Amino acid sequence: MSEAHVYPVKENIKTHTHADNDTYLAMYQQSVTDPEGFWNEHGKIVDWIKPFTKVKSTSFDTGHVDIRWFEDGTLNVSANCIDRHLAEHGDDVAIIWEGDDPADDKTLTFNELHKEVCKFSNALKDQGVRKGDVVCLYMPMVPEAAIAMLACTRIGAVHTVVFGGFSPEALSGRIIDSDAKVVITADEGVRGGRAVPLKKNVDEALTNPEVKTISKVVVLKRTGGNVDWHGHRDVWWHEATAKVSDVCPPEEMKAEDPLFILYTSGSTGKPKGVLHTTGGYLVYAAMTFKYVFDYQPGETFWCTADVGWITGHTYLIYGPLANGAKTILFEGVPNYPNTSRMSEVVDKHQVNILYTAPTAIRALMAKGNEAVAGTSRSSLRIMGSVGEPINPEAWEWYYKTIGNENSPIVDTWWQTETGGILIAPLPGATDLKPGSATRPFFGVQPALVDNMGNILEDTVAEGNLVILDSWPGQMRTVYGDHERFEQTYFSTFKGMYFTSDGARRDEDGYYWITGRVDDVLNVSGHRMGTAEIESALVAHHKIAEAAIVGIPHDIKGQAIYAYITLNDGEFPSAELHKEVKDWVRKEIGPIATPDVLHWTDSLPKTRSGKIMRRILRKIATGDTSNLGDTSTLADPSVVDKLIAEKAELV
């Protein structure tokens, strides 16, 4: 592909930043040569009830994987996110809520948030919730979702948030695995102008005979829609909080007490319950938020993620609030009621830092200048990308069109399992290359290894991305299945955390994530990441989105099968077919030319916007007898449509 353009650090950022390049290099060096000293100092970014004296006790050894940080310290997460700001900033805005309907919005100050969290903490206690109990949240994107999470942390309950788009089957599986005691939900959610039947889904999930632990369901009235009511079990939020005190002292928690379980889909079998603990997670969330987004006091931060994903946990709730930031909770979608909604929200709330996903960026990019019509976005200072590698063309569009070429982009690489960002630029320190996540965060030691686990020492290299030592935000185990934790992350390459991603490192030591290792093609002995070919395809001015899978080929081993979605107003033709193949040949080389072009107007995506490649692989190879779990798909009907289109290709 064409050589990346380099964007130097902007002068206006350089003059007022937490870390310039010299600071980054010095801090990073200390963080990897003396992690104990580094985190002993920076662990103090949060307030401790009992200060820690032990910083790090970690092992990646087979059979003895054990991760503990700050283990003899005690603290409370909600006190760090709320109480410690009250004396000086109690009247400052903590949460801005922007409803699905642009006419709906409200704010909560830290004082107001404190009162609501204390009341709901007491309401949870009234429902029998005690320290260590698991509480399941199945909520719309409303302030009460944040209030419920913070209330759990206040009383020492463990929350497990299930994205409100998941099916009753997916919800019941997570309730069963986590032994949750209480479910918190709403009558309905609202998204893109449509009602989401949350309470109905909970009722259905709880009919599963394997669900044996739920004693209460707390229901928030969001729309006032009709719901079935089970008097012995169901409780209205407004009634549960009406008569309780608004004083609730925070529970003193050990650093290694569980904070939350968040489920991520496993490649096989049941979902994995990723367990994060209290001290290390909060330190890492606060630290990465402050430095990666170069957060300055008084700024407004908007992470567009749902609270049901790790990005929503770390960079919508805990990271911003621990730093006393104003955080925006957005109920809607970026293109409703019109394509410029995201830009309108930026202007309306004078957003300084915007953090969104390549999927959203590409969807807006397909609409061209409509995405910014009638808006200035002049308040933006920093923009971020999360969820998957961002292709250079989408990066450039985001930078130029949304950001007016004024805001550096922090392209962040991390996972549910990592708790926070592992590789990303720092705005005041790192020259940017579109498509590269650039350099590791403090304390993170990435390496590239070959398939035998040998570390590739050369600066320029490509291989499997591993992390050589622990960091505070790392998950501690798979809930209830430590052996699965070891097998999944530490058995492929001994003594290393395997990310399951591939990456290449360039001459400047920058990392370029090439995609999941199982998304690597081997065509005539040439290894290629699917992300690289997809990037080349979406660089074509007529293509909105592309997904690449490999299919068996008698001669080449694998052939390249491309699913392609065109921009509005473009249509497939024999000329375009040839043009697209020639384009990839020019961008990457003949070896990367797709063998099959499958034109379609929609791809199978999970509700978080990730393309479900497993299904695309099966459709491409004609193996559609067992497509596995499709409960997490946003629109399951896409699958039948793709199968029908495939039949016409043959």
UniProtKB/Swiss-Prot annotation:
Q: Does the keyword Membrane apply?
A: no
Single Gene Ontology BP term? acetyl-CoA biosynthetic process from acetate
Q: Write out the GO cellular component annotations.
A: cytosol
Keywords, A to Z? Acetylation, ATP-binding, Ligase, Magnesium, Metal-binding, Nucleotide-binding
Q: What is its EC number?
A: 6.2.1.1
CDD domains the record matches: ACS
State the signal peptide span.
Answer: none
Q: Which reaction does it catalyse?
A: acetate + ATP + CoA = acetyl-CoA + AMP + diphosphate
Q: Does the keyword section mention Magnesium? A: yes
Q: Which InterPro entries match?
A: Ac_CoA_lig (IPR011904), ACAS_N (IPR032387), AMP-bd_C (IPR025110), AMP-bd_C_sf (IPR045851), AMP-binding_CS (IPR020845), AMP-dep_synth/lig_dom (IPR000873), ANL_N_sf (IPR042099)
The modified positions for N6-acetyllysine read K610
PTM (free text): Acetylated. Deacetylation by the SIR2-homolog deacetylase activates the enzyme.
Q: Which residues bind Mg(2+)?
A: V538, H540, I543
Name the enzyme's class: ligase
Q: Which domain of life is it from?
A: Bacteria
Q: Which residues bind ATP?
A: G387, E388, P389, D411, T412, W413, W414, Q415, T416, D501, R516, R527
Q: Note the Gene3D superfamilies from the entry.
A: 3.30.300.30, N-terminal domain of ligase-like
Q: One of this protein's Pfam families, by short name?
A: ACAS_N
Q: Which is one GO molecular function term here? A: acetate-CoA ligase activity
Which cofactor is essential here?
A: Mg(2+)
Q: Which residues bind CoA?
A: R191, G192, G193, R194, T311, N335, S524, R585
| Family listed | Belongs to the ATP-dependent AMP-binding enzyme family.
Q: What function is annotated for this protein?
A: Catalyzes the conversion of acetate into acetyl-CoA (AcCoA), an essential intermediate at the junction of anabolic and catabolic pathways. AcsA undergoes a two-step reaction. In the first half reaction, AcsA combines acetate with ATP to form acetyl-adenylate (AcAMP) intermediate. In the second half reaction, it can then transfer the acetyl group from AcAMP to the sulfhydryl group of CoA, forming the product AcCoA.
Q: What is this protein called?
A: Acetyl-coenzyme A synthetase
Task: State the organism named in the record.
Answer: Vibrio parahaemolyticus serotype O3:K6 (strain RIMD 2210633)
